[in-house]
From Swiss-Prot:
Swiss-Prot/TrEMBL keywords: Metal-binding, Ribonucleoprotein, Ribosomal protein, Zinc, Zinc-finger
Stored InterPro entries: Ribosomal_eL37/eL43, Ribosomal_eL43, Ribosomal_protein_eL43, Ribosomal_zn-bd
Cellular component aspect of the GO annotation: cytosolic large ribosomal subunit
Name of the featured protein: Large ribosomal subunit protein eL43
Organism: Eremothecium gossypii (strain ATCC 10895 / CBS 109.51 / FGSC 9923 / NRRL Y-1056)
GO molecular function per UniProt: structural constituent of ribosome; zinc ion binding
Amino acid sequence: MAKRTKKVGITGKYGVRYGSSLRRQVKKLEVQQHARYDCSFCGKKAVKRGAAGIWNCSSCKKTVAGGAYTFSTAAAATVRSTIRRLREMAEA
């Protein structure tokens, strides 16, 4: 086998186009976008991106709304913690 790309990774398809800093930003997004994530329902590492913001678990067939490029966003984590805190305050 021929030696594969070391630095550019998935953005090797762009060649020398678009500039190195833009390709670096795109690489970060595309690696997150194509990765598999842990399913919060069945616990398996089987969640893949179906479309922008739609994430599907291939194991339990659940569909979850998330970020466009990542399964969970920082804003979603903030909302979850706020809801949990408000629920605990209401119960107490």
